[in-house]
Amino acid sequence: MAKKFPLFHPFSRRLHIVLLCMIGFFCTTFMRIHFALTMTCMVNSTALAVENEIKLAGNSNVSEISIIEEINLGSNGQCGLMDEDGQKKVVVDYGGELVWNSYEQNLIFSGTFWGSLITVLPSMFFIERFSPRHVLQISVALYILVTVITPFLATHFGYFSVFLARIGMGLGEGFVFPTNNAIIGNWFPSSEKSTALSIFTLGNQIASAAGSPMVAAVCASDLGWPATFYFAGIFATGWSILWFFTASSHPAKVKMMTKKEKEYLLANVVKKVHKSEKTRSIPYSKILTSPAFLGQLQCHFFVNLFMTLFQIYLPSYFKEVLHLGVIANGTFTAIPNIFNMIFKVVWGIGIDKLKENKILSNTKAVKVSHGVASFGSSFSLILLAFFVDCSNPTTGLIFFCLMYSSMGTFVSGFYTSLLSLAPQYTATMSAISMFVAMIGRLTTPAVMSMFRKDGTAAEWQNIFIGCSLAHIFSGSIFLLFGSGELQDWAKVEDDQEMNEKEKLKTIENGIVVVEEVDVKNEMSATLVKEDSLCL
């Protein structure tokens, strides 16, 4: 049995890989969700308010509208839709120039979800036939292209051209999770998957925690909102170059790694792909009828619906209900994500330690994690629904931090379950799960269109209550059917398991050669003496 090589080590190659995946996930998430805060800067709220008043009143009398920029966080603000005299409608305007109503905004937000819905299922075939590393790189290139041309499309061709471009971005998004899941599945043993996934998905929170203040600052500067798109594209291009020269889909293909780590991964993760495995059919019927898989599948739907709602619409809530200015909006959007990051990583490391020490089984670990996320989030949403308005925005921030901290354990719950049920079918199961997740994301704008007409506090209260009930429902289902164990239908036959053992051959110069069979051809990976690096 190979001795464990620590994950958190300067020469840990799998740590380097998951950090690269995390930064890449930050880039794709930021290019997708920064539009939420940027939209509040792009849109002329005053013009929209006037337009709505004319439609409602049937005339052009717009004297009933009061424009404000923000409220003083240290004092009672103007709550609801009426100002102090009870007559004028209060509108917070960030000085945008585009007149896009709520329907047009929701259509734009839904574009990426429509695109990803098209590609997420076919992604598994691409990943099985091509390197996940290259597939991910092409996907990010599509993100970059759409991001940098968006300002031109918005100002010259209108909202529908932006919607079409966002569909193009979504075509790339459909590959992001399946490719990263495949790479992480190749690099990490089951005892480290919760930690690895916690690190990888940090990119999501960093995109909001670091990205939101940056977007707010750029929007408020002379550069204006178009610069946010250009900055996002430039940063993603830098990551893409780094990824091309340093990343690998599989440990056996790495040219630079310590001998100790490679032996550890060969013994605990790396599996040879034999001819008998190449022709083995994927058990779709067993996958789609597995209670454990279906349990995490519905979680994927609801969690993505919730996350999309808060990623896209939280800046609107801060603007419409709490009446925050653009800088305060960016700050309030960022802070809960910082709590999420810290709690997620600490929880992921802690839960893996409990599994490693046999205190918790894999199944108990994912159920405890998911239970904390679901019921903790539900409780926080009830507090937000009944105890927060623009007179106490700081209280609202505290409740959001509580909710985001709770949601940090989702990764150690249903997401870890997905990668544990049948590791050899990770690409297929990830694609199916992401297809359902994309339906959840696509559902979000439709749900918001139904419940959010004018952006009133009452409308947001109903949204929070509905999300709270959905959290309870989804969490209860996972507690009944969820699992973190390898499923019986996914176990490899004994004779194949014996063939999984790697054959090491020592040659006279001290170099150790590992014979590794790839999906397409025979390949060899070279290792050097202990405590040295391969170049």
UniProtKB/Swiss-Prot annotation:
It comes from the Eukaryota. One of its GO terms (biological process) is sodium ion transport. The gene is slc-17.3. The keyword Acyltransferase does not apply. Glycans are attached at N44, N61, N329. GO terms for molecular function: symporter activity; transmembrane transporter activity. Gene3D superfamilies: MFS general substrate transporter like domains (1.20.1250.20). This is Uncharacterized transporter slc-17.3. The keyword Transmembrane helix applies. It is found in: Membrane. Belongs to the major facilitator superfamily. Sodium/anion cotransporter family. Its main location: membrane. SUPFAM superfamilies: MFS general substrate transporter (SSF103473). GO terms for cellular component: membrane. It comes from Caenorhabditis elegans. It is a multi-pass membrane protein. Keywords: Glycoprotein, Ion transport, Membrane, Sodium, Sodium transport, Symport, Transmembrane, Transmembrane helix, Transport. The chain crosses the membrane at residues 17-37, 107-127, 144-164, 167-187, 199-219, 225-245, 292-312, 331-351, 368-388, 395-415, 429-451, 463-483.
